[in-house]
Amino acid sequence: MVLLRPELPTDAAAVRELHRVAFGDHGEVVAGLVDDLRADDRAVGLVAEDAGAVLGHVLLVPGLLDAPRRLVPVYTLSPLAVLPGSQRRGTGSALVRAGLQEMAARGVPVVFLEGDPAFYRRLGFVAGADHGFRRPSLRIPEPAFQAALLPAYEPWMTGTHVYAETFWRHDAVGLRDPDA
């Protein structure tokens, strides 16, 4: 039976290996990103485990919304990983839902991500541009830039999503064009 729970410091090695395997050619980069992102004590990591083995992980990291009225503390859901042999069984969806519940309980108004709209829209995410949100980088394809509006969201909260500095340091924002 799969159990969802907060990530513990003792999970670090298993979570690192999970991201390394799940992200294939980009696994080392993503694993290093996770190592650095979790250094922020406001980051929220959740794991899915079965019989003591970590099968999935999601990380929610503080960011900002640069709204006309003021800066708004928000979160970014990134990354999400499930072991390849455990995918398509609802583990990733369960981790995302649990993460959104935790963010709502903390009074976070919006959670942003860049990802597959077909997957994340089923979990309550909407196109960011539809609510006046701007991508932090033009390298993020418009359809991939998504937001989950939580109960603390107010309509005046529009503007540019600002990733945590760690994403920029790892060059993990949007897609690079090798032919540019």
Regions found by a protein language model. Name each.
Residues 134-179:
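C-terminal "cap" of GNAT-fold acetyltransferases
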